[in-house]
């Protein structure tokens, strides 16, 4: 992969396009590589699958900047439009990353990351995930909910969703998920009963 990336960059330089071309290196998913006894990509919400690289080189922007804000691949389209001097159409998901290429975090930037997997035949293995810096909550409509402390348990080895002492965290993370579902117009509520499998708590507006 390093060699092929080098070939692409070399060709851009050969054609004289380096100074007016934005280069983005990313991927659509990670690989478990044996973590959690899993290989390849999977129908799970572990970091190995969902924490992917995103490297952007843009002419005229600062070099060597590393940002730890939550970004998603849906942010790429608005970024490309912004770089080209175009307006992002109303209703488009995602936000431009151009300010971050100068080391600036836009005001009101998201404080969580949201991921979705639609499984097979709409329901089998379907799941949703919302993650803050400290907590990750995974909603599995037809399985066990998951809650991980990403600071003390970055390997996601200890599911806290069934512990009574973390019910308040579940409620808080569930509200964050509802906000994400509304923002991305997720239709999962039309498929499932919206009942969490942890202590019979419901995922509904009535919890707000």
Predicted regions, residues:
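Outer-membrane beta-barrel transmembrane strands
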Residues: 1-2
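Generic structural signal for small/hydrophobic residues in well-ordered secondary structure
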Residues: 5, 23, 28, 53-54, ...
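Non-catalytic, well-ordered alpha-helical segments in soluble enzyme domains
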Residues: 6, 59, 68-105, 152
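Histidine-centered active-site microenvironments of extracellular/periplasmic hydrolases
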Residues: 10-72
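Generic recognition of well-ordered alpha-helical segments
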Residues: 51, 72-83, 96, 100, ...
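Low-complexity, glycine/alanine/valine/leucine- and proline-rich hydrophobic stretches
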Residues: 127-144
